[in-house]
Amino acid sequence: MKESYTLKSLAVLLENNKISSKEVTTEYLKNIENGKELNCYNTISQEKALIDAEKSDERRKSQNLRSKYDGIPIGIKDLFCTKGVTTTASSKILSNFVPNYESTVTVSYTHLTLPTINWV
């Protein structure tokens, strides 16, 4: 996989079965790991992202996609609550806050079925 893709180019590659969502997600996770010293991400949800990617690949095989972006990984700003995921807003005061609800923003991404990799 090359260094970077646009949203549109990834959607086309997925649509034409040139690459799977799991492959894209795995590559993004590797890039995040390789750039860890940059300290760009507060939380990385590798397991959840890979499960979401596999589900997307299954939907693609059964031609049951929820959007043309189904399966393209995304990072979510650490200001938006995601059920069961530590949400700190980069504040030490919130370092242990794990919401039991979804924000409107994360519900929208879930509807598009984008594998959520990290919280920035």
Roles of regions detected by a PLM:
Residues 1-50:
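An N-terminal boundary/leader segment
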Residues 35-36, 68-105:
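Enzymes and membrane/adaptor proteins characterized by extended Gly/Ser/Thr/Asp/Glu-rich
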Residues 110-116:
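Conserved small/polar residues in nucleotide/adenosyl-binding loops
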Residues 46-69, 76, 99:
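Flexible, acidic active-site loops/lids enriched in D/E/S/T/G that coordinate Mg2+ and/or position polar
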Residues 31, 35, 52, 56, ...:
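Short alpha-helical functional segments enriched in proximate histidine and acidic residues
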Residues 18, 63-65, 85:
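Conserved SET/PR domain catalytic loop and adjacent active-site segment
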Residues 9-10, 104-106:
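Residues within well-ordered alpha-helices
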